[in-house]
């Protein structure tokens, strides 16, 4: 499959958006030669395992018009920059604790003339207690960030009541979901849908759409590192 074939396999992508996605992939791969943005080194492989993979989280049901997205632990901008390209009407916050990756993203979004992106350098536990970010997003995404009990504690405080956390997982998602029932209960959250899929390269993926039904208790998230050391299962 060519880069064009990969992005055009999604019917909701216009030609203009497809070209921006391809250009972003090119920028990531070029920068990856001098900075470790992603373990993937091949341009075509990145189109599948980064761009295509990021697009799979998109479902119009969970991404309202003029809404706000937070991509937690955005890394090289997947899926956050991809979603910002796809939905220019939505405001997208890209958050990560690694400043150098965010510096690259800032440069890249300026080159792509994306006006709907904000880059935030912070740990999730610190940002989630700030009023400007808490209970503020229609959808929060996280791609391959920690186990589900941990990332749920970090992500759900950012989600508005009635909004969604979209956890992008690989094989073993059902096991992680089974281990997350206690934290989801504490967070007043429940699973709305599970989307299973296979990438063109053959890897299995699962996306868990978790709905936030009530306000997050003030004790969450716990202090930095606590969710990793003592996950609530």
Where are the regions a protein language model picked out?
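Conserved SAM/SAH cofactor-binding pocket of Class I
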Residues: 55-146, 152
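Class I SAM-dependent transferase core
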Residues: 1-70, 100-117, 225
